[in-house]
From Swiss-Prot:
InterPro entries: Ribosomal_uL5 (IPR002132), Ribosomal_uL5_dom_sf (IPR022803)
GO process terms (BP): translation
Name of the protein in its database record: Large ribosomal subunit protein uL5m
SUPFAM superfamilies for the chain: RL5-like (SSF55282)
Intracellular or extracellular location(s): Mitochondrion
Annotated family: Belongs to the universal ribosomal protein uL5 family.
GO cellular component: mitochondrion; ribonucleoprotein complex; ribosome
PANTHER family, sorted: 60S RIBOSOMAL PROTEIN L11-RELATED
The entry's keywords: Mitochondrion, Ribonucleoprotein, Ribosomal protein
Top-level taxon of the source organism: Eukaryota
Annotated GO MF terms: structural constituent of ribosome
Gene source species: Oenothera berteroana
Amino acid sequence: MFPLNFHYEDVLRQDLLLKLNLANVMEVPGLCEIRIVPKTSSTYDFIIKNGKLAMEILRGQKFIQTERGSTGKSFRSNPFLESNKDKGYVSDLARQSILRGHGMSNFLVRILTVMSLLDSRVEIRENSIQFSMETEFCEFSPELEDHFEIFEHIRRFNVTIVTSANTQDETLLLWSGFLQKDEGESFKWKTP
């Protein structure tokens, strides 16, 4: 059975999809990828040392390191990790981790399972949904709880769910169920 079957049957109801008045079913927006970036409260060295392991545990798949240039230095900044040009070198880990395919589906099932229990601010953009998973997310995930010493210095994970939607309204319509809490109230969300 498709891991997100419940999401498509219970959250993405057909009446919502029909409101889009799409001529072709291939035009219905879908999920492209999930981007995950850890934010820490301690030193930059901690990110290099333990961040890789934390990402492997959280994502459920091995972290793949990309090739560096011949100089071994990069001066690109990453606003998610609050890194900047003064630090000189930005490791491959400082760049966001991207999930696609089966790993993405499994991680999304986990997110959808606990999001209604967490108090996260959700931001809907043109073709993406952005939110932060605080450390309280560990309480709902046994493998994170078992390795809490690795996660104790990570303040949160910034998560971006990228869709193939063309407008913010399409994204909001398709993911409106994602914003519902168990008690019937809605998540706090904002537009850019």
